[in-house]
Amino acid sequence: MLTEKIVKRRKKETKILFFESNKEFSSDLLEEKYKDESNIYIVNDSAEYIGKYMKKYDIPWIDYIVSGLPFASLPNDLSSNILKKTQKYLKEDGKFITFKYTLLKKDFIKEYFSEVSVKREVRNVPPAYILCCSL
């Protein structure tokens, strides 16, 4: 549902990379669903390799990163690698937006950003937290 909203609200010239580590989901569902959409790239790989795909698809910087990664259950080194790459490639005025069902890793995420705001989304079941982060 989040993927659909992002696609629907984007400008046509906007390039979007969707990272999905589940091969069946990325190939069978996402690639098929968005095969006729220009500038949408489905990547079956870890988000920690974002630089490789930015180069491949000629994306010089990133305005927004929207993440549903379960940082609470990812190993710290993987989480750290992904957040370091986020710092590296996010535009100075860009935003990293992530949604969580727990705030367990909020302080960990805050280490990588100068500003982090938290909103609780009670319309989601279960309720979720949305962290909006700036460099």
Region annotations inferred by a language model:
Residues 1-13:
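Conserved SAM-binding loop of SAM-dependent methyltransferases across substrates and taxa
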Residues 17-19, 89-102:
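Conserved beta-strand signature within the Rossmann-like core of class I S-adenosyl-L-methionine
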Residues 19-21, 25-60:
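S-adenosyl-L-methionine
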Residues 59-77:
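A short SAM/SAH-binding and catalytic strip from SAM-dependent methyltransferases
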Residues 79-92:
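A short glycine-rich, Lys/Arg-flanked "PGG" loop and its adjoining helix->strand segment in the class I
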Residues 97-118:
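Conserved class I S-adenosyl-L-methionine
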Residues 120-135:
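Core SAM-dependent methyltransferase catalytic element
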